[in-house]
Design a protein with these regions (language model features):
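Helix-turn-helix DNA-binding segment
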Residues: 1-34
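Hydrophobic residues on short alpha-helical segments
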Residues: 11-15, 45, 57
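Residues within the DNA-recognition helix of helix-turn-helix
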Residues: 40-43
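Basic, Lys/Arg-enriched C-terminal extension of HTH/homeodomain DNA-binding domains
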Residues: 46-68
Length: 68
């Protein structure tokens, strides 16, 4: 099995994002700050070389990192 490019926390954040949770809701659910949620999202976008959340989601699905 291939090693995930996402940390467990990044994966949790994106799994909630694709379920239409807001940044605030994700922060509350994972018991972390809004800023930390945004940092996780930014880190993933940097890893993937994409400019937006939607593009990150598409790439993660292509890479089998996320299932919808």
């Amino acid at each position: 099995m291939m090693h995930s490019i996402l940390t467990n926390r990044e994966k949790q954040v994106f799994e909630l994002l694709i379920q239409n949770y807001s940044t605030k809701e994700i922060a509350y659910k994972l018991n972390i700050s809004d800023k930390t949620v945004r940092n996780h999202i930014s880190n993933v976008m940097l890893k993937l070389g994409v400019k937006g959340r939607a593009q990150a989601v598409v790439e993660l699905i292509k890479l089998n990192e996320l299932r919808v």
